[in-house]
Amino acid sequence: VVEEAIITEIKATEKAAVIREMVYSLRDSQKVNSKDVENIIKALIKREELGSTGIGKGVAVPHTKHDCIKKIMGTIARSTKGVDFNALDGEPVYLFFLLLSPNDSAGAHLAALERISTVIRDSDLRRFMREASGKDGMVEILREVDGIQV
């Protein structure tokens, strides 16, 4: 997780805008090259067209693999109002875990997705992340969860 790119209150109110804002936060943290931003956003939106990454219980995990990504990375965003992300349970999404991986890292990408899904199954963790006081509070919660690198 790129700590500098965590968004404690995302401004976006719809799916494509959430994805865009999260990728921009990685660009602003100098983890994604400006020239690659639009291609990454397109790849994430294309992935969403295959099936929503809104997995339910207020969580979405937009993810993609792309040639321009050299190292697996991710960030987190939170919405206090909730966003319609076409989640599988039809409920709004409050927590977004974005994952970007190099094209040649299928195993690591799947392992990271598995780790994220394991962690967010915990209803207490989801509640704590939604209620955390700012970025520092969110980071502290992640650090307490075994295996999350911030």
Region annotations inferred by a language model:
Residues 1-150:
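Cytosolic covalent-transfer regions centered on His/Cys nucleophiles
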